[in-house]
């Protein structure tokens, strides 16, 4: 029986967050067996629209839109790139403290929007925010 130890999903698990049909039929229908056997650690995308179904169907560590978890000698940090990641934001402060406290050999951070984009729309200046973050990237 080959199965993943866990599933990381970078958001947009559905196309229209308020549409319950999409959660039930288009996500959980096809993924039922996989999700039943493996832990699922998503990050929220823009298509979920911060809808209550996301928080109802996924049981995530508080505050749910950003969190961390460990697997082996790795720690994973999940942030919501739909919300502010500026140095004075709640998420940034949490990530800064969490990275400093982490004893994991490997540290991974994931989110929905790309860090860099090949076009002029870099999704809310994500790349500029990352450049300002400085050593958060190197911890």
Regions found by a protein language model. Give the residues of each.
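Active-site metal-binding loops of divalent metal-dependent hydrolases
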Residues: 1, 11-13, 46-47, 81-82, ...
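N-terminal active-site segment of His-dependent metallophosphoesterases
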Residues: 1-21, 117-118
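Receiver (REC) domain switch-region micro-motif
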Residues: 7, 107-109
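Extended active-site neighborhood of metal-dependent phosphoesterases/phosphodiesterases
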Residues: 21-107, 121-139
């Amino acid at each position: 029986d080959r199965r993943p130890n866990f599933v990381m999903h970078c958001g947009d698990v559905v196309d229209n967050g308020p549409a319950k049909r999409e959660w039930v039929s288009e996500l959980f229908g096809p993924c039922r067996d996989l999700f039943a056997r493996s832990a699922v650690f998503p990050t929220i995308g823009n298509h979920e629209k911060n809808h209550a179904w996301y928080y109802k169907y996924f049981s995530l560590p508080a505050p749910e839109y950003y969190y961390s978890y460990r697997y082996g000698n790795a720690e994973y940090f999940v942030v919501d790139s739909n919300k502010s990641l500026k140095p004075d934001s709640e998420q940034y402060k949490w990530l800064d403290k969490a990275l400093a406290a982490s004893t994991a050999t490997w540290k991974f951070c994931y989110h929905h929007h790309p860090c860099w984009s090949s076009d002029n729309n870099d999704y809310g200046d994500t790349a500029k925010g990352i450049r300002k973050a400085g050593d958060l990237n190197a911890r």
